[in-house]
Amino acid sequence: EINFALSNSQGGENYGWNIFEGKHCYPEDSNCENSGFIEPIFEYPNDANYVRILLGLKQKNPNMDGCSITGGYIYRGTNIPSLYGRYIFGDYCTGKVWSINIDDDIENLDIIDHTQDILKGIGKKEFYLSSFGQDNNGEIFLVDYNGAIYNLAIKN
């Protein structure tokens, strides 16, 4: 799941932990109430077969799959202008990397799969994402399972 707080937030938002997993009761058979909780702006299930029915989200790429969202950063660098202001995140199990617009219109999320372009940009055929980093200039780094660090680069 991806949670979002406005920049003027005072903090202390309640995203439902440990009663919810995304927008769903946890454990599933519990009778949970969501009053006072802030729902995530995006989620996908561990079982990718259900992503197409996920709460009516409009996605550019309906083939999202994975097991665990690996959080990233809002891109503030200058090397890839098309990503400026977008939240970059990935999946721990598949190595896929997406970006999502983060603005006031969280009802109409624009989700873009950058995986193939990133693989070309870092010169690899596959990549397994374990973490992200960001430098003082807003450029983003990708860390793989083996500890190698790559500059975020996109080649079309």
Predicted regions and their residues:
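Conserved blade-ending motifs and adjacent loop-strand segments that build the rim/top face
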Residues: 69-70, 106-136
